[in-house]
């Protein structure tokens, strides 16, 4: 299940472009009532195609958003830990390569994460990397630090600092930080090198089928610029590990 359905994609784009539903409707040749009905869950591929150019979205992708699901992840080295968060979920990602284990983010409360790690026979990962300081990503961090796990992040209490462009070598893996601010400020993505394919942990900057919400139009444009800057050089087969929802690939997005 995607983190955002088509109504959230619409609302995030409208907010990011400082457009009202009426303004978007007028520019797209639609009625305001059609756009409002779409925003409330009445999907229409035709309306999606009409709105997409106004919202700077891919028309074919937006028209298909109601059916879109990325291909399932089939890598034994990467495990999605699906953790509860309010009425939804949040991800932690466990990455194993030979004797090296990494954890990306830690959920909102420690108990479900610690239980999952114990069940996976990995109570103490070799290192933790935190994408950003929102509460649903750092809740398990203090307990894991107390277990002796080194943690890395940017402006996150208890972590060793890592800045965009810097890297850390953990066992067989190299983790390189990049700037994915916009939804959160600061916010890091983590390139993970040494696996069988390129991997980028995106936090809440990018989900399958959408991006993280931004507080202002300026931050929305900033977020898009940082995503383009980070993603453009990467090969299409790059695996993307988001903070919510399923893993995806650069080619899929």
Predicted regions and their residues:
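Short amphipathic recognition helices of helix-turn-helix/homeodomain-type DNA-binding modules
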Residues: 59-73
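Core dinuclear metal-dependent hydrolase active-site scaffold
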Residues: 93-96, 165-195
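Metallo-beta-lactamase
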Residues: 109, 120, 184-253
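Short alpha-helical DNA-recognition segment
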Residues: 17-35
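Active-site HxH/HxHxD metal-binding segment of metal-dependent hydrolases
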Residues: 109-176
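A short, Lys/Arg-rich alpha-helix, primarily the initiator
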Residues: 1-17
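DNA major-groove recognition helix of helix-turn-helix/homeodomain DNA-binding modules
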Residues: 46-61
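Conserved beta-strand hairpin/beta-sheet module of binuclear metal-dependent hydrolase folds
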Residues: 69-118, 190-203, 209
């Amino acid at each position: 299940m995607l983190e955002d359905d088509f109504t959230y994609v619409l609302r995030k784009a409208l907010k990011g472009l400082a457009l009202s539903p009426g303004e978007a409707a007028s520019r797209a040749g639609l009625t305001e009532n059609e756009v409002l009905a779409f925003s409330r869950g009445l999907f229409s591929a035709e309306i999606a195609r009409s709105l997409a150019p106004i919202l700077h979205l891919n028309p074919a992708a937006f028209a298909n958003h109601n059916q879109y699901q990325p291909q399932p992840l089939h890598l034994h080295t990467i495990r999605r830990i699906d953790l509860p968060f309010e009425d939804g979920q949040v991800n932690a990602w466990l990455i194993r390569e030979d004797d090296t284990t990494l954890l990306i983010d830690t959920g909102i409360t420690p108990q479900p994460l610690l239980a999952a790690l114990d069940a996976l026979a990995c109570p103490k990962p070799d290192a933790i990397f935190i994408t950003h300081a929102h509460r649903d990503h750092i809740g398990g961090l203090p307990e894991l630090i107390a277990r002796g796990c080194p943690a890395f992040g940017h402006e996150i209490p208890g972590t060793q600092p890592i800045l965009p462009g810097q890297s850390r070598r953990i066992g067989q893996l190299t983790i390189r930080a990049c700037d994915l601010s916009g939804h959160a400020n600061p916010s890091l993505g983590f390139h993970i090198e040494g696996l069988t394919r390129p991997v980028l942990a995106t936090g809440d900057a990018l989900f399958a089928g959408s991006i993280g919400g931004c507080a202002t139009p300026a931050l929305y444009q900033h977020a898009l610029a940082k995503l383009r800057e980070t993603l453009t050089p990467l090969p299409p087969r790059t695996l993307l590990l988001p903070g919510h929802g399923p893993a995806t690939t650069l080619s899929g997005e």
